[in-house]
């Protein structure tokens, strides 16, 4: 589903299913706090897997739209499942594509406030640690608190609201 242009909070889902549902909850909670919010489902963006062989090739058509959506939203929430103890390939590949296009990809990340969250069948802490490291390396300001949820510990509305309060400061 395409995100609306320039929402105050862009909630990015790096997997479908439970993390997309979590992303929708974040977007609704942001709206309840008076912020414009939209959900970007990365699994619906038609980007090929980034490889070094493609680096010199023309950028995929969908990349410009993705870059525009990300640049147009001052705050992000990223909801990502844990894949083999790390970041979902769709998110890693999107970041790689963004990093090789344009002259200053770091401007997309520098000082951008970001909340990270997961619904994971496993622990979920490993993906958030990996994501925090990567986003901090790129210059993002990752909110200190994060949200870990799973079947036995679902995300509470209060936790989502509290994270958004921190993000919207």
Model-derived segments and spans:
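Glycine-rich phosphate/pyrophosphate-binding loop and the adjoining helix
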Residues: 1-7, 27, 141-169
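N-terminal beta1-alpha1 ligand-phosphate binding loop
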Residues: 2-35
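Hydrophobic/aromatic beta-strand patches that form the interior of the parallel beta-sheet core
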Residues: 10, 38-40, 77, 115-117, ...
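Cofactor-binding loop segments of dinucleotide-utilizing enzymes, especially the Rossmann-like FAD-
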Residues: 14-16, 42, 119-121
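A general structural signal for well-ordered alpha-helical segments in protein cores
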Residues: 19, 23, 63, 91, ...
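Short beta-strand elements in bilobed, periplasmic/extracellular small-molecule ligand-binding domains
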Residues: 34-42, 49, 141-150
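N-terminal beta-loop-helix "entrance" segment that forms/cooperates
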Residues: 42-60
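Helix-loop-strand module that forms the ligand-binding subsite of alpha/beta enzymes
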Residues: 58-138
